[in-house]
Amino acid sequence: HIAGTLLREGIIPDAIIITDPQPHMYQQVKGLDTKKIPLILLSTASSSVLDYYEGPVYIAYQNGYRKAEEIAEKIGAKAFETGGSVTTTALDIALQFKAEKVIFVGVDLAYTGGNSHAEGVGRRITDTGSLRKVISCSGEEIYTSKNLDIYRKWIERRIANLTGTVIYNTGNGARIAGAPCRRWDEFLGE
């Protein structure tokens, strides 16, 4: 859904990454003009996407899944750490391909403004009983879930001793150690 949101706003992503094995994932790209946008499809992601994707497709093989590791080794491909989410997978891909700069936009890893996802995509979070609090980029306490906090900590471990790549965290989501908080509009025009 986020790919469609970006394209409707005139923002052309460098790539679209799909990691989810659910059969309905084709809905993420159905009807979108993707002819010039590469798709990175995790080897265990839903192949239904391929019926609707018009651009170039690259398969990403993941570490920790024996079949994927074997195929990657057999064909001489890289294998990537997935960390459990599309964001963590995308980060590892960017880092393994030596990205100089990674800018997290929309990677809140918390329920910023009480919402589960970007405006118009997710749902309102009203029950905070099972949630935990973390510090946001603006210095305030915000709620997050156990899973989102695991992803945040995974990212922090992955970038802890990183050299050659600068990671920026935009928005008012959870603060990520090692990723300075910046306003996303500071990067417009780059």
Predicted segments with their positions:
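Metal-ion/cofactor- or nucleotide/acyl-coenzyme-handling active-site neighborhoods
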Residues: I2-E190
